[in-house]
């Protein structure tokens, strides 16, 4: 008796060819591997419909916890998280979690500026360039770190533990734009987010700069926040009447549009039942909102999905509040302040 005969005798369910494509959960019947092969021979293999890997959040955002593996400048550490940075582009944000009393800068490295260019949300320094031997290489399934640091940030030091947050470029999720300032008040900068941004994080990057980071949030269209080494509250206008699905507007301040200066903007979408993600193509995966706590300083926020990454800041105080960062890998007890080099606490 062959294995096929044996299993056919044990499992006697009737084989009914499904009446729809693979992703259609309403299709009746079950595909049998041998029937599938027979259909291939007969050129009758079913269509896979419109399943798109970019529709799933796991292909667009990943949290990865890893251990550093070197104190030198040539050893590598390959981080495989399934994100295609080499072909699609995106941002890698790394932070050291431990290491005794030694704090470490945040490190933001993106595919637009390249793997040797470092920015830190806890610093107003310009884009810093690491030694060519130490860098981040962007792969089609993650990234590879060479060496133990970039310029100021430890990202792979042996004996320390790190978290990385990877955002892949994708319409209605995340985009990166760079531009050179022209000194115009009301300068319009185009983007490829394909929707109106929910949040924009902007930084001047040229060497002569010591300008603070600037943040737009849809909660307060005509305000700006500074997320680097300060917990300041909302400041005066920067963003004009607010961004659209094709562009955003900046004034001519040194931190936003000084003539000849260079800038980078990280754009985050806000889905409002129009994300178009997931297998059904009708799911949201990112939101930028606001909430009010009750008398017990509690609040429940219904996003419509289970978040992996949460960043929040008090918005109704002139003295501001910390930028708090949490994620599902470290849990709600693992807090980072994006404006500080402090270790996880």
Language model regions located:
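Surface-exposed molecular-recognition determinants
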Residues: 2-11, 15-345
């Amino acid at each position: 008796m062959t294995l096929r005969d044996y299993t056919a005798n044990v499992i006697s369910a009737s084989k009914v060819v499904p009446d729809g494509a693979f992703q259609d959960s309403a299709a009746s019947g079950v595909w049998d591997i041998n029937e599938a092969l027979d259909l291939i021979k007969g050129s009758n293999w079913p269509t896979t419909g419109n399943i798109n890997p970019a529709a799933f959040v796991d292909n667009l955002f990943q949290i990865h916890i890893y251990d550093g593996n070197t104190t030198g400048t040539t050893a590598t550490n390959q981080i495989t998280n399934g994100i295609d940075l080499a072909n699609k582009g995106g941002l890698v944000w790394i932070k050291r979690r431990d290491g005794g009393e030694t704090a470490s800068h945040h490190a933001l490295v993106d595919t637009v500026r390249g793997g040797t260019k470092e920015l830190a949300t806890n610093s107003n320094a310009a884009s810093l360039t690491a030694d060519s031997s130490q860098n981040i290489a962007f792969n089609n399934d993650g990234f590879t770190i060479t060496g133990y640091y970039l310029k100021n940030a430890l990202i792979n030091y042996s004996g320390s533990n790190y978290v990385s947050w990877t955002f892949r470029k994708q319409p209605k999720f995340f985009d990166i734009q760079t531009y050179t300032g022209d000194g115009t008040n009301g300068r319009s900068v185009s983007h490829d987010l394909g929707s109106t941004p929910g949040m924009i994080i902007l930084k001047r990057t040229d060497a002569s700069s010591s300008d603070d980071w600037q943040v737009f949030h849809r909660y307060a269209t005509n305000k700006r926040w500074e997320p680097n080494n300060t917990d300041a509250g909302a400041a005066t206008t920067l963003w004009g009447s607010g961004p659209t699905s094709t562009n955003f507007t900046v004034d001519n301040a040194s931190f936003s549009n000084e003539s000849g200066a260079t800038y980078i903007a990280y754009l985050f979408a806000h889905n409002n039942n129009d994300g178009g993600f997931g297998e059904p193509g009708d799911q949201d995966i990112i939101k930028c909102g606001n909430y009010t706590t009750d008398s017990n300083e509690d609040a429940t926020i219904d996003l419509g999905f289970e978040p992996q990454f949460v960043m929040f800041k008090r918005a109704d105080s002139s003295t501001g509040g910390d930028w708090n960062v949490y994620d599902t890998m470290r849990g709600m007890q693992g807090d980072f302040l994006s404006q500080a080099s402090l270790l996880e606490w």
